[in-house]
A protein has these predicted regions:
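Substrate-binding groove/exosite segments of carbohydrate-active enzymes
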Residues: 1-143, 154, 158
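Catalytic cores of carbohydrate-active enzymes
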Residues: 28-30, 43-56, 60-62, 71, ...
């Protein structure tokens, strides 16, 4: 029996390709059944609120479900901020009873790009203002070196998402740049002009150094990385 969050199917997609039409319907219902009291990886194996999963699913909601579904994202954003550790680390899944491990790149994905995507889809500035103090503490936990690059932090789980050949050093720089730029937008939105200016300047300097040190002429790579070129790094670097 299919169960999901208290919302309705609202988005639609149709084309002359039956396979794509079927994929849309399956994707829409897959999203729905991964939403109950929180977003989840999947209802069969993993029902915890991993923030990396939320970062993807919350955007899908805008195109496929009724606006009431955005309340689940609002709940997640506030919980994520409320469970911040005393050392400024933000971690997931939360709420939790026996887990406090940080996956830095998942956290950056949500606190920067995720929060701003939520605002762009809802106009809910109150939630941005609510989570901003936690975001500020987390952003400033990262140490920026004199050349503008951010000092690499593996966290408790050094994971670059699924797949092999993860250029973690390069990926970290790209994610922190993305986070800074979206954090600056949040700061500007709620009147934190000094933070917005700082984050914008820091992102600009990071990007300049990143291009000079990591671009090989054909791809972004850290000089100590020996594996195949990481497509994740290229993607995040481009969107940042």
């Amino acid at each position: 029996h299919e169960t999901g969050y208290n919302c309705s199917f609202a988005g639609s997609f149709e084309c002359d390709n039956s396979d794509l039409n079927s994929l849309w319907k399956k994707s829409q219902r897959t999203l729905y059944i991964t939403m109950r009291d929180n977003y989840m990886d999947c209802p069969d194996r993993e029902r915890a609120q991993w923030i990396g999963d939320v970062s993807n699913e919350m955007v899908e909601v805008f195109y496929s479900l009724s606006p009431s579904a955005n309340l689940l994202t609002r709940k997640c954003a506030r919980e994520f901020a409320d469970w911040q550790r005393s050392d400024s680390v933000m971690y997931a899944p939360v709420p939790e009873g026996n887990w406090k491990k940080e996956l830095p790149q998942q956290t950056m994905a949500f606190m920067g790009l995720g929060n701003w995507n939520y605002y762009m889809g809802t106009g809910d500035a109150a939630t941005i203002k609510y989570v901003f103090p936690a975001a500020k503490r987390y952003v400033h936990k990262w140490k920026i070196e004199d050349n503008g690059l951010v000092e690499y932090r593996p966290g408790a789980w050094d994971w670059g998402d699924w797949g092999d050949n993860a250029d973690m050093q390069a990926l970290c720089q790209a994610w922190y740049s993305t986070t800074l730029k979206n954090y600056a937008k949040q700061a500007d939105l709620i009147g934190e002009t000094a933070e917005a200016k700082w984050a914008t300047a820091a992102a600009k300097k990071l990007d300049e150094t990143f291009r000079n040190k990591f671009w090989t002429g054909s791809a972004y790579r850290h000089d100590t990385y020996k594996g195949l070129t990481d497509d994740r790094t290229q993607s995040v670097a481009v969107i940042s």
